[in-house]
Amino acid sequence: MITKSFFLKNFDRSKELIPLSYNDVFSAVNQFLKSYTDVNDIDIIEENLIEDPVFELDVLELLNEDPMLLLDSKNPRVQEAKIIANKAKKNIKDYFNLPIFFDTDSLDKNVSVYQKAELTEKKIQEIITSKKSAIIFKPIFEIEDCLIQPDAIIVHEKGLCEFVVIKATTNTKRKYFLEIIYDFVLFKKIGKYKLLNYYFCTVKYELQNKNNVSFFLNTEIKTSKNSFSLSSKEKDYFKNKPFNHPEKIAYIHKKKSNGVNGFLIVKLIDNLIKNNIVDLNKISDFVTKEIDSKSVRNIQPLIKNAAKIQINFWDQIQDIKKYQELKINQIVFNYSENFDSFWSNYLLRNLIKLVFAHKYNEIFKLSGKLANWSQLTYAYKENKSITINQLLHELNQKKSKANFNNSTNKISFFLEAWNSEKGFAIGNKFKNTWNKLKKKKVYFDFETISSSIRIINNSLPFSQIVTQCSLIVDKNEIDDKRKLNCENLIFDPLFISVNDFKKVIDSLYQNNCSDYSFVVFNKSFEKNRLLEMATLINEQIYKEKVKAIVDNLFDLADIFTIENNCLAFKQLNGFSSIKKVLTIIDESFLKASKSIGYQNLKIQKGDVAQEVALSRFLNCLNKNEWNQVAFELKKYCENDVRAMISIVLFIQDLIKKNDLFTFYSEN
């Protein structure tokens, strides 16, 4: 039986991955890479898998991808999904101001899909007969071995219907068009009813108190592939306004809500196909005029791609059916252009990229900062044996002609490292950047919890709420960095409050902050969390303390970020995450800072730490269980801090060994 989730998988991954969950793919990747001795564990546990810069985990989508997760009552995402779904249902009822006639979720677990479909049909007929509109939650329709499962159907007289689909995210995305196409074409095939409208019930971007989540019903969809984010100009305008500024919230909500009416576009295309108009250019021209989309960029490619799917819908359904029964041991990781999909990026695409680097060509090792996916796949398609050196030279030449100076310098700088006997290059900004690091240092790292359900009062959906802070104060009085004490603050997510934020800031703050560098890895994250905590505390003394800390932040990641022209390393392939950087550091520096390999920790990734904290917040862990796991969370966060010390020691040694005493002595 084909589901909508199964249909969507057809557009962002190779066919063999369609029936597999994300966990299945992780297992298969691990199995495949075992035979390659050059693969470090860090490559596989690397956190930076998500390509979307404003990624919000839609837990409902995750569970649709892998329904087996629903069987795990201890899984925090299952509990989170239940809360979101129940609150969304209430919002939908209030929006339409109609009675709930039936909800298939209220049925016994043993009731089959087919029985639910029969009951749905029966209840719809009862509503039509009553000549009064009503809501059915979680209806199920079966047609041509396919299931239609909107979260709600609003039934009116004469079989006129509206669909509502719940999304546990504040953003709509281009791929939602695929959902409308699937539901519209199949529902039309039933022949008994007429679909009038299609709503997405998304999380509303607004302030809410602890344990709350609110929703917004919208017919419009963003046309971008990734989530909405502010432009540089917009960021500049709002940079001095706190996260809870009413103008900022209203502006972002409006930007997230605006788009094009996806259902209208799908319906217009369907009418043209019905009249035997299948020329994509004609369809695109007509629909563009009808929807008056002058303000929407790149709408025509979207219309053409949607039309192509609608024209070939039934052929695609038949094609998908062939791959329903594929098993995990049959995966050979076929190369597929679907990984460069127009509609969406496969969530684990960077993991697949690692496989491709070993199975097909080394160019897939490169960071997206040097070559994006489209450039990699095009180069591979044109020349299967192309090398990294050849590819980067070609890209460099093209960008030089186009006068993209920043991109050109970035690639040139990495090529210098790539072709160096030492395997690294020193850029002209290294000295000035490194010399900003002061002798006295406070190394620190945050761990957070994030959900659409608010963790704390007066917060926005998906706010990163600090639950942990590990810090080491180095007053430059101890040569043996192993003796430096680490303070590990951790707060029970169930009871977290602004008083906990005060403890974090008080611990970080030093007398004469200007004498210290507050060392982090990826400054924007810690900086934003500090500013948010100060806003939530809303006391002048803490605003002043945070300003003193923020003014003296030093970002170690700046040294390794390729576009900053400081240090470039061949082994890093353009990547700059802390876990990647640690792979090029000799073990002696790790021992000198008392840090250990992440693969030796029970908690190895930031997203796992978040899941654990969320488990406690949603009462999936009791107090005793939380106390036990808190010890492991502290070890993980402390290791991030000690890893930063080892990186500083590594750079200092690099400077010494390369006779760069100018840099070293000034530091």
Swiss-Prot record:
Pfam families noted in UniProt: DUF2779 (PF11074)
The name this protein goes by in its record: Uncharacterized protein MG366
UniProt source species: Mycoplasma genitalium (strain ATCC 33530 / DSM 19775 / NCTC 10195 / G37) (Mycoplasmoides genitalium)
